Amino acid sequence: MAQVQYYGTGRRKSSVARVRLVPGDGRIIVNKRDIREYIPTEALIEMVKQPLVLTETLGSYDVLVNVQGGGFAGQAGAIRHGIARALLEVDPEFRTVLKRAGLLTRDARVKERKKYGLKGARRAPQFSKR
């Protein structure tokens, strides 16, 4: 018999994470590597686990993630978003908890483009009166 799987796609900055939740013992596998091997900082790992902690499902699902694009912080945010969306498929009752924590909202903040005539997105060249 086929195993039950729940899917969710998360995005943050330029990262996209495709997340699968499978009943298991709480392992988190990112791009075929353990999360502790893949993500360098403990703070980002805790951020990824946040939806599971809030819904009290931390030890009951294995999380299989395929993530592309961006850096570690963007990828961690995308994984968190994907896990939150997948948990909605597990139980729609989780929506209120996840929504209140802001985990279902796509964080739309991205780097502003550099404009010509300026040194950065907004930083202007030094002004000289004389």
UniProtKB/Swiss-Prot annotation:
GO function term, MF aspect, one: structural constituent of ribosome
Keyword Ribosomal protein: yes
A single cellular component GO annotation: cytosolic small ribosomal subunit
SUPFAM superfamilies assigned: Ribosomal protein S5 domain 2-like
Keyword Membrane: no
Gene Ontology BP, a term: translation
Domain of life of the native organism: Bacteria
Keywords, in A-Z order: Ribonucleoprotein, Ribosomal protein
Pfam families given in the database record: Ribosomal_S9
Family: Belongs to the universal ribosomal protein uS9 family.
HAMAP family: Ribosomal_uS9_B
Protein name stated in the entry: Small ribosomal subunit protein uS9
Origin species: Geobacillus kaustophilus (strain HTA426)
Gene: rpsI
